A protein has these predicted regions:
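Residues lining hydrophobic/aromatic ligand-binding pockets adjacent to catalytic sites
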Residues: 1-184
Length: 184
């Protein structure tokens, strides 16, 4: 279950405790790190914010399958060292996933190879974004128009860089239309 709300605001401790109470021990969440860290500060000078966020989320740490570092399109290859330093602040084998949006990381060139190699070496998942279905939908209502304006249109690069690959599938509003995107 993706916890997208953490991207927009850090929940209260009470909310986190309610999420814990509402789930079984074998349930796994995927939480996004706050956009204040990933987008606004672009992983710079955010150690205190990260510490505060992780402290609030602590009651759920054993129920997190992956922590998502969703990066903005402006976060490119020139920032890779910053990503490396940021991820090094987590304990080894902490369940991290990185979602990139800069087109250089989809070019099959040296920048993408460097990213993927580093992710493999550090057991960090590269999150696969598949937004094709939402862009295949006719923009005939507000929700679709909004999604098409906000969601990234990046190539689908099916790659597993660690042991828990994750696909963010942004589906077509008509369920039947999604099936063609599941076929290789």
């Amino acid at each position: 279950m993706e916890g997208n709300t953490t991207f927009y605001a850090t929940p209260t401790l009470n909310t986190v405790q309610n999420w814990r109470a509402a789930t079984h021990d074998d349930f796994r969440f995927t939480f996004k790190l706050p956009k204040a860290i990933t987008h606004e500060q672009m992983l710079r000078g955010c150690s205190e914010q990260l510490r505060d966020f992780m402290k609030v989320m602590e009651p759920l740490h054993d129920r997190v399958g992956q922590w998502t570092i969703q990066l903005p399109a402006a976060f490119g290859p020139e920032h890779l060292d910053r990503l490396k330093n940021f991820c090094a602040s987590f304990p080894p084998n902490f369940p991290l996933g990185v979602e990139v949006r800069h087109m250089a990381f989809f070019s099959k060139g040296e920048e993408e190879r460097a990213l993927n190699q580093w992710l493999v070496e550090n057991n960090i998942d590269r999150i696969i974004m598949d937004s094709r279905p939402v862009f295949a939908a006719k923009p005939n209502n507000e929700a679709i128009i909004d999604a098409q304006m906000k969601k990234p249109r990046v190539p689908v690069h099916a790659i597993a860089t660690a042991s828990h690959p994750l696909i963010r599938f942004i589906g077509h509003p008509e369920e039947q239309q999604n099936y063609e995107f599941f076929t290789p």
